[in-house]
């Protein structure tokens, strides 16, 4: 489909699905378990990948919403689950243009993430060990910190959607 701009070849970038939870989820949910195409250039970390996207016309990359929405050098795009479904933005509309950045930055569309209308939203879990071992106690303590009011504020400050 015509999206405007010059007619460029698409250069996809990704983290390795074997080492990235986001890339693994993308392969599982979007590609239905099929491997990434050979054209996909694997990057070792998100920051260099975002820099490469900013420097490469026609490139595309996916990453967690908190790592991309507030960036000044790249544009996040709305996505839909099917051709007849509405596109949902990972940011609060209207989109703030990069020319206004860094004085103004796009904000995360927390409602779309919380109510799962953003198609690639996923939940993250803390899994702890059972029992009374030091590891189990530490895991429960960590969970309790995250579920506390202060923990929920820290989760939100990191760009994620609090659970409470």
What role is predicted for each listed range?
Residues 1-164:
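Exported/periplasmic ABC-transporter solute-binding proteins
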């Amino acid at each position: 489909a015509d999206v405007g701009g010059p007619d460029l070849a698409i250069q996809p970038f990704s983290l390795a699905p074997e080492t990235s939870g986001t890339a693994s989820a993308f392969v599982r949910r979007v590609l239905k378990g099929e491997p990434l195409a050979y054209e996909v250039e694997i990057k070792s970390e998100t920051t260099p990948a975002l820099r490469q996207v900013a420097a490469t016309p026609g490139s595309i990359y996916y990453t967690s919403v908190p790592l991309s929405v507030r960036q000044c050098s790249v544009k996040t795009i709305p996505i839909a689950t099917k051709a007849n479904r509405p596109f949902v933005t990972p940011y609060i509309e209207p989109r703030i243009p990069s020319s206004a950045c860094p004085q103004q930055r796009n904000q995360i569309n927390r409602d779309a993430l919380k109510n799962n209308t953003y198609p690639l939203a996923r939940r993250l879990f803390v899994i702890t060990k059972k029992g009374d071992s030091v590891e189990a106690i530490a895991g429960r303590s960590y969970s309790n910190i995250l579920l506390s009011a202060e923990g929920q504020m820290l989760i939100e400050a990191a760009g994620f959607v609090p659970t409470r």
